Structures are given as structure tokens and as C-alpha cells.
A protein has these predicted regions:
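Extended C-terminal regions of large enzymes
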Residues: 1-350
Length: 350
């Protein structure tokens, strides 16, 4: 089923999640220079197609279609070599390419791969640090697109310099230290690579998921951009609440089962796939689950997470995007996030 899904046709095994660079660029939601635009002129130099081609041409320790484990049939990763064929690190994921690439005005895949490796070695998140880097550029701490200055700053994280410590703490801290208004975080977590003004379903997820802004918590890109599991116009508000709600419930269950999220593409695309997943879990654990139980489980998990947040002082008032997403147009579609706070409050109505 995984091999036959529509997402498979986009060649995840050949381009990994970086296959999304061109797709999201075409949709006008590839966030550029701290959300100034949804389009990046140098996007092709950081695309999955380019990453695949460069890896093959350089050879050496580079690998295309590398699985996270021996039994993986998706093999949506790879190993990225330098110009001499020596390993830099794993293939950067789409989110990493975006945060250190378009978001920071950098179009050099080699240096993005080095940023990725530094984050892995230090133990910091590439989205949060990449968004923080873009904020530092917006604040004038270093120029947009200055790959060398950015690389030097990345090394300062492990060196423990004052600015390195600020960046290592992520975007929320960068915004506070520099007194910035346009800080793209929800509940302290950085917004990932899809601009909520042009992919409004994922904007609902960003605003409401208990964990803070996270695309994977309810990946509305499926129906908004990829046309997987149906189609909901990404530029309109209609249908986005229901889409995000359904996907957040499903994702909570998928996570609880320990399954790879890419397996959800098959569940969304193939009517019998969910039944197959439930049968698999029943056979493995001696259970008698039904497909209805999957929904109930997801709802229960989300309710528990929201209750935890409330006890920790994170109330429903935190279920919102930063104001600039509602106040500023996003080129090239010139759209805003226009789903009201009252509508967002209905996401968890069950």
C-alpha cells in the first residue's frame, strides 16, 4: 500500500522529504526571509531533485534511498557527501533545508548539510535553530544569505558564546533577547516550513496542537497541497477546522501505536488501509480493536495532553498564531490567516 500511494509517485525514496521544496514553492507557501514571502528564487538549488543528483554525481560515501531500518520499504533518507565524496551527514530533511535555506536566504545545499550535522552533533532542533537564525538575520545580527557567517555562528552554539547560547535556545529566546514583534512561534515552539496564510489547514494545527506549532501533529498539507485523502483549498478557510481536527486525532493514534507517520498516507489514500493497520495491532498485541477505537484513542490522547497543558498554565488562550499572520499579506497569493479565534476553539469539540 505504501508503495502504491500517490505520495510514492512523488518519489519520496529518491528525494526524501526534500521532494516538497518544489511542491511547496509552486503552492506559494515556501516561507522566505522570516515570512516575508512564500516564494524563494534559489529554491531549486536546495531541492530534493538537486540533492539526489549531487549525491549520485559525487559518489563516495553518498547514498540515495537509505532506510532508517532494514525493513523499511519507503527508504526516505540518504547520506550526503561533500565534493570529495566524504560523508557530511544524512540528507537534510525538507524542514531543515527550509529553515536554513529559504527562511535564512541561503541556497547552498552543502552548507545546509553542514548546519544539519552540527545540530545533530550538538543535540538541538534544526527547525528551531534555523528559525532562530532567520530571526537573527531579520534583526540585523548578520546579513540574509551570508552562509559563512551563519556557519561560524552555528559553531558558537557548542562553544557557548553569548550569541551561540541565545541561538541554541531557539527562536523564542532570540525574539525575546532582540525585542522582536514578528516571532513565528506558538507555545514557545517555532512554526515549521509551511506558511499558515497559504496552507490554512496546517495553520489551524499550528495554533491548536497541544505540543506547540508542529506540522506533523495534524499534517493538513495532505489535503491542502498533496491532494491525499481529498482536496481542501489551502487558500480558503472553509473546511480547515474539520481537516485539522480529523488529522490531529488520527496522528495521535498513529504516534501511540509507534508507527511511522508516512504510513498515514496509505491510510488516507486507500479505504482498506486503516482496517489493515487495526488488524496488525490486534494480531501483534492480542487485542480486539475496531476502527472506531482508533478515533476514541486519538481523542483521549489529545484531551489528556490539553489537560496537562492547563495544569501547567498553558490555557486555551495560547491556541493562536502570532498576530502578523492575520495582519500581513503573504506574496505571491497575498492572503492572510483569516480563521477566527472563535473557530479555533471548536477544533477539540467532541
Amino acid at each position: 500500500a505504501l508503495v502504491d500511494t500517490s505520495v510514492r509517485l512523488r518519489r519520496l525514496s529518491d528525494r526524501a522529504s526534500a521532494a516538497l521544496v518544489k511542491i511547496v514553492q509552486e503552492g506559494g507557501s515556501l516561507r522566505t526571509k522570516n515570512f516575508a514571502s512564500g516564494s524563494f528564487e534559489g529554491h531549486e538549488r536546495g531541492s530534493g531533485e538537486t540533492m539526489n543528483q549531487v549525491t549520485k554525481e559525487r559518489g563516495g560515501e553518498g547514498v540515495v534511498a537509505h532506510g532508517c531500518m532494514s525493513g523499511c520499504i519507503m527508504r526516505c533518507s540518504g547520506l550526503y557527501p561533500d565534493k570529495n565524496g566524504k560523508l557530511i551527514g544524512k540528507w537534510p530533511e525538507y524542514e531543515t533545508i527550509w529553515s536554513f535555506g529559504p527562511h535564512s536566504g541561503i541556497d547552498d545545499l552543502d552548507v545546509i548539510a553542514r548546519y544539519d550535522r552540527i545540530c545533530d552533533d550538538v543535540g538541538v532542533d534544526t527547525i528551531d535553530v534555523g528559525v532562530g537564525m532567520g530571526l537573527l538575520m531579520a534583526a540585523g545580527a548578520l546579513p540574509y544569505g551570508d552562509a559563512d557567517a551563519a556557519l561560524k555562528l552555528m559553531h558558537e552554539i557548542s562553544e557557548g558564546t553569548p550569541l551561540g547560547r541565545v541561538l541554541g535556545c531557539g527562536a523564542e529566546t532570540v525574539g525575546r533577547v532582540y525585542g522582536m514583534r514578528r516571532v513565528p512561534t506558538v507555545k514557545g515552539q517555532s512554526l515549521p516550513a509551511y506558511d499558515p496564510r497559504a496552507v490554512k489547514g496546517v495553520g489551524v494545527t499550528y495554533a491548536t496542537t497541544p505540543m506547540g506549532a508542529d506540522h506533523t501533529a495534524g499534517y493538513a498539507v495532505t489535503a491542502n497541497i498533496l491532494s491525499v485523502g481529498g482536496k481542501v483549498d489551502p487558500l480558503k478557510s472553509d473546511g480547515q477546522i474539520a481537516l485539522s481536527r480529523t488529522l490531529q486525532i488520527a496522528t495521535a493514534s498513529v504516534d501511540a501505536a509507534g508507527l511511522c507517520l508516512f504510513g498515514a498516507f496509505a491510510v488516507l489514500d486507500i479505504p482498506d488501509a486503516l482496517v489493515a493497520v487495526v488488524d496488525m495491532l490486534n494480531a501483534k498485541y492480542g487485542l480486539t480493536l475496531t476502527t472506531d477505537d482508533v478515533v476514541t484513542l486519538g481523542q483521549s490522547i489529545l484531551s489528556t495532553e490539553r489537560d496537562f497543558n492547563r495544569r501547567a498554565g498553558i490555557t486555551d488562550a495560547a491556541d493562536r498564531l502570532p498576530d502578523f499572520f492575520s495582519d500581513e499579506d503573504l506574496p505571491p497569493h497575498n492572503t492572510r490567516f483569516d480563521i477566527s479565534l472563535e473557530e479555533l476553539k471548536t477544533v477539540f469539540n467532541w
